[in-house]
Amino acid sequence: RNADFVFNLAGVNRPENPEDFMKGNFGFANTLLDRLKTYNNKAAIMLSSSIQATLAGRFGDSEYGRSKKAGEELFFDYARETGAKVAVYRFPNLMGHSRPNYNSAVSTFCWAVANDEPFTVNDRSTELELLYIDDLVEGMFDLLEGKEVHCEFEGVETVLTETGRYCCVPVTHKVTLGEIVDLLEEFKQQPTTLMMPKMPEG
């Protein structure tokens, strides 16, 4: 009711039924915005969306992406209606502190390699854009201070522009699934080979 800033990081990403994507992501966003309207609270609000909302490339048939896209449009409509500041972030894949075998390929691979557990890589050439969770948090502090970075999207590519209606954390890393697995295997063998894997910059 008296919030000065609202972060909407909630979302459904592994439902039992595909239709629950829309109920959980769009439905909750709608409820949240209605509650703000009820109390005439025009606090700035942030939406955690996904690169899948571009519905481009391999995300073209993503029910999750469609639900996130619907939530985005709801937020943009809310901004036009109320004049409130809205910051919509289309996050790529996240890496960092997270639980394996849930929704982070990097965490799953790290855990599997470290514990000699089997894992599957369907296509080693698949490229991921990764955002480190600590960089995401830093980006949220920047948003609170009015220093957010704006962008638009060309397919799944982020294009920085001061007039963009989206926001982004510009520090990301692009790597293939095969490169991730190979690097993890090199780290695992380091006590035997005594060779430190080559670390990418950044």
Give residue spans per PLM region.
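NAD(P)-dependent short-chain dehydrogenase/reductase
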Residues: F76-V88, P92-L128, I133-G146
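Conserved Rossmann-fold NAD(P)-dependent oxidoreductase catalytic core, especially the SDR/UDP-sugar
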Residues: N30-E72, T82, A87
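Short-chain dehydrogenase/reductase
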Residues: M22-F26, D61-K69, R99-N103, L130
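A general structural motif
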Residues: N2-A3, K42-A43, D116
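NAD(P)H-binding glycine-rich loop region in Rossmannoid oxidoreductase-like domains
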Residues: R1-F26, T31, R35-K37, Q52-F59
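Hydrophobic/aromatic beta-strand patches that form the interior of the parallel beta-sheet core
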Residues: F7, M46, A87-Y89, C167-V169
